[in-house]
Amino acid sequence: MRYALLAASIFALSAHAHADTLVDNIKGETIATDGSLQTFSALLFDDGGTIKAVYGPGARLPKQGRNGYQYHIDGKGRVLLPGMIDAHAHVIQTGFALLTLDLSDTVSLDDALDRIGKFARAHPDRPWIIGSGWSQDRWHMGRLPTAAELDRVVPDRPVWLERADFHAGWANSAALKAAGVTAATVSPQGGAIDRLPDHQPAGVLIDHAADMVARAVPITKARDLDLALATAEADFARRGITAVADMGTSLGDWMAFRRAGDGNHLYMRIMAYAMGTEAMAAIGGSGPTPWLYADRLRMGGVQLLLDGALGSRGAWLKLPYSDQSGTSGTPLWSETQLGNLMSRAAMDGYQVAVDAIGDKANATLLTTINDLTHTYSGDRRWRIEQAQVTDPANWGLVAEIARTGGVVASMQPAHQISDRVMAEVRLGPDRLRGADAWNSLKHEGAVLAFGSDTPVERPDPWTGIAAALTRQDDAGAPTGGWQPQERVDRLTALTGYTSAAAWAGFAETKFGRIAPGLRADFILVDTDPMTATPEAIRKTKVFQTWVGGGKTYDAEPEPVAAKSGTKH
């Protein structure tokens, strides 16, 4: 029922255009083909949702009528921008995070346990308690939580809670038992089981070890995936996001996207990157899929994970962690395995996107890409996802790859805000110069595509733009910005969430800018990101979101006008 209501509410807003529609009385801004800022005062799109014309200030507009446009949208003097694009998102996980137990705002272990207990009591019919968003760093614990602590509030059924970075999970004793994880269980390659002094599993499983519990969770039903997608779509639309790069698309995710498209309720554009080469082959077969549903869905690439997260000390570093000298992190693949997987995808024409967090992971990935460019030439647009900690000594490889097959630094400005204090502890002062090095990587020739990694962070492009400009959190800390030399300018920030994010997914001929021939994906907002203060940008209000000439979100819905020539 909830899915039906969500779908119906969006469908009511998403009526398609019938004949040409003029949007005027706007302050329009978009990125031009040469990368500069282009301003305009009106645009015209057709009944297929494609932009026909863009009019500069003072230009003569067409007339309404039989030989002109039929419908009119009054922009009310608001700012019109291309729809925002989240260059690194997890669509279905975002929906589930909104539907299940959310621990992202808990401030202590006791706070989390209280929330977990209340949630379990409120849902006595759920065979498992599922949730996400916890972080021992945010709780200032200095250690990982345990199964015994979970057992105190939910002793009667399994509990599985993924960490905020989704690179670790916290299980109670019932979940460990259901998964068969015992003192005798060996940690898999690319994973680790946190253990008690007697070698019993303590409760947290990291990276590939977490898969053991995840596989024991009851299989998600198709209707649950559909509800998660509809929930995520509504959340993206209200934030002004019209397209995403969905990283780690499973076959089940893909089928949910296809069901939505077949049912005419896929209300945003999804550039899908399959989770590993097996899912890639299952979805696309011998090559990327074509664009489907009027350019709303395509699987054109594969996502591979090279290491774990910095917060759970899974990120692969060149030197040991500053706060735990016994480990340098966990590579999930050997260098040979990584090269083979990337080659397997590249030979069939798939775009390759690899998550690399630590400086050793990034150095290994850059070397591997550079080697592969000799075999796989042409416009490849190799994607480095996260690129959280890089070694300046390796930046020269970025420039070399940029000259050959092209390289995308797909980065998440909000991570810098939430991870700053933790990164200082994990890395120590000597490695911070290469942390979230947006400006330096851009200078070396990488194309910056910005996203959120939702549900790890909120899919809020306005927080991301403000963070990219200032390297400060919402409270303005730290003064002057963290590693301020890595701040980017306003044009780069806006480009990162629009045209560059489209280019990063080989979609620049479809959407990402306001230009004739591209899809009419746009938003009306109250704030101009090219002139407003960072504080104002963070508070940006989205009034309307349009995808392919159809409205998918309206903050101020009005009754349909009696005159056929007016659109709301």
Give the predicted meaning of each segment.
Residues 119, 535-556:
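P-loop/Walker A phosphate-binding loop and immediately adjacent motor/lid segment at beta-alpha junctions
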